[in-house]
Amino acid sequence: MNWMDIRIGQGYDVHALVEGRKLILGGVEIPHTRGLLGHSDADALLHAITDALFGAAGLGDIGRHFPDTDPAFAGADSRVLLREAVRRVREAGYDVGNVDATVIAQKPKLAPHVPGMVANLAADLGIAPGRCNVKAKTNEKLGFEGREDGIVAQAAVLIYRAEAAEQD
């Protein structure tokens, strides 16, 4: 395997917290008084990971593949979009190595929900749970996250050329 067979991608997403929406992160519905505003289910964590996957494979970004102007994606389950992104990355000749993600939210406390998020990620990415990491952070009451106006997610993924791994 040479260095061109391994690629990394970085993803970012942010959504506003609003009344009347469910809060879904990592495919887990989290009890809270507000949820994330968006065209789909607004799962910022899965959107950041999806974006990172597309970027790593040189396939653009989430908006290119699942535009928020397309009614077909209104209310879409982001787990379905993530699985489709994985399919497209594999079609381009890559497999997922690992993912490391951070969710930044002042409230609610996310740590109790991280195991469910990791289980969903492992299932959707087709990798072992030990290759999926999710960290929950606050912003120490600073910025829009600290004011509880929104939630941010950041992700890094590693992908590798599938046939190169088979040759080793």
Swiss-Prot record:
Pathway: Isoprenoid biosynthesis; isopentenyl diphosphate biosynthesis via DXP pathway; isopentenyl diphosphate from 1-deoxy-D-xylulose 5-phosphate: step 4/6. It catalyses: 4-CDP-2-C-methyl-D-erythritol 2-phosphate = 2-C-methyl-D-erythritol 2,4-cyclic diphosphate + CMP. PROSITE patterns: ISPF. Binds 1 divalent metal cation per subunit. InterPro entries: MECDP_synthase, MECDP_synthase_CS, MECDP_synthase_sf. GO terms for biological process: isopentenyl diphosphate biosynthetic process, methylerythritol 4-phosphate pathway; terpenoid biosynthetic process. It comes from the Bacteria. Keywords: Isoprene biosynthesis, Lyase, Metal-binding. Pfam families: YgbB. GO terms for molecular function: 2-C-methyl-D-erythritol 2,4-cyclodiphosphate synthase activity; metal ion binding. A divalent metal cation binds at residues 13, 15, 47. 4-CDP-2-C-methyl-D-erythritol 2-phosphate binds at residues 13-15, 39-40, 61-63, 66-70, 144, 147. The record marks 39, 138 as: Transition state stabilizer. Its EC number is 4.6.1.12. Its cofactor is a divalent metal cation. Belongs to the IspF family. Involved in the biosynthesis of isopentenyl diphosphate (IPP) and dimethylallyl diphosphate (DMAPP), two major building blocks of isoprenoid compounds. Catalyzes the conversion of 4-diphosphocytidyl-2-C-methyl-D-erythritol 2-phosphate (CDP-ME2P) to 2-C-methyl-D-erythritol 2,4-cyclodiphosphate (ME-CPP) with a corresponding release of cytidine 5-monophosphate (CMP). Homotrimer. This is 2-C-methyl-D-erythritol 2,4-cyclodiphosphate synthase. The lineage of its organism: Bacteria, Pseudomonadati, Pseudomonadota, Betaproteobacteria, Burkholderiales.
